[in-house]
Design a protein with these regions (language model features):
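Interdomain "pre-motor" coupling segment immediately N-terminal to P-loop NTPase/helicase cores
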Residues: 1-10
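Pre-Walker A (pre-P-loop) alpha-helix and adjacent loop at the N terminus of AAA/AAA+ ATPase modules
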Residues: 13-76
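Walker A/P-loop
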Residues: 70-72, 79-106
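Conserved catalytic network of the ASCE P-loop NTPase/AAA+ motor domain
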Residues: 71-74, 97-99, 134-140, 165-167, ...
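AAA+/P-loop NTPase substrate/partner-engagement loops
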Residues: 99-124
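Conserved alpha-helical scaffold flanking the Walker A/P-loop in AAA+ ATPase domains
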Residues: 124-142
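Conserved P-loop NTPase nucleotide-binding/switch module
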Residues: 150-189, 198-204, 208-235
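Conserved small/polar residues in nucleotide/adenosyl-binding loops
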Residues: 253-260
Length: 262
């Protein structure tokens, strides 16, 4: 069944409507669809509020602006999808992008390297998004970037060898995730003196990272059983029963870098 764009990001519908649209194309994964629908709704609601605020500022004189309360700025947020290979993470993101009619760029984190080395640098992902938006900067700035295999960006254990595809890539990625202006080539995948450059602001781009995080279940089991007591009077109840932050605690052990854990 071909996915037709039926949702408008300029008047983003309620999360239950987004989820209902996903139900027409994606079978199962109920929890993932619900969480993603809420996250997308919150993201584009913030984007539209930000655009409205900028438009009001352009139509406001300096004197009026000084007397106007700007309100609270809503910080940018991104998404992390955890699931085994073949569970439908990429398909879910593709379907969502088509329903919203926004450009989508998909990349594999294992192909990313530090700028200047063989491979794609992190800024090339923004170039792909611009190309998907037919070089329309404004449309690209409202798009989605999906970075798969994010768990493969863990820092290499060999400290004597330069890490060009691990922590160095993470540092460059953090700038984009937090929101920054990036210069990218127009109509090309790499920077070239003969290719015109343009600036893309990543503040309103939705970044979705996906990964299998192998070994995470073992870390959770180890954490649960570490302080387990033995004997006839042992307390058999898990210490972390009902701990909503358990997954986040365990991700600390598999997260690529300390700053990415946020």
């Amino acid at each position: 069944k071909k996915v037709e764009p039926i949702l408008d990001i300029h008047s983003i519908p309620a999360p239950h409507r987004i989820k209902a649209s996903l139900d027409d194309y994606v079978v199962g994964q109920e929890h993932a669809k619900k969480v993603m629908s809420v996250a997308v709704y919150n993201h584009y609601k913030r984007v539209m509020a930000d655009n409205k605020h900028k438009a009001q500022e352009e139509n406001t004189t300096a004197k009026q602006a000084s007397n106007k309360y700007d309100g609270v700025e809503i910080e940018k947020s991104n998404m992390l999808m955890i699931g085994p290979t073949g569970s439908g993470k990429t398909y879910l993101v593709k379907t969502l992008a088509k329903l919203l009619d926004v450009p989508l760029a998909i990349t594999d984190a294992t192909s990313l390297t530090e700028a200047g080395y063989i491979g794609d640098d992190i800024e090339s992902v923004v170039s792909k998004l611009l190309a998907a938006a037919d070089n329309d900067v404004e449309r690209a700035e409202h798009g989605i970037i999906f970075i798969d295999e994010i768990d493969k960006l863990a820092k290499k254990r060999n400290a004597n060898q330069r890490d060009v595809s691990g922590e160095s890539v993470q540092q460059g990625m953090l700038k984009l995730l937090e929101g920054s202006e990036v210069e990218v080539p127009v109509g090309a995948s790499s920077k070239n003196a003969m290719v015109p450059m343009t600036t893309v602001d990543t503040r309103n781009i939705l970044f979705i990272c996906g990964g299998a995080f192998p070994g995470l279940e073992d870390i959770i089991k180890e954490r649960l059983n570490k302080e387990a007591s033995i004997g006839f009077k042992a307390d058999l109840k898990d210490k972390y029963d009902g701990d909503e932050n358990l997954l986040m605690h365990c991700l600390l052990y598999t997260s690529p870098s300390p700053r990415d854990r946020g």
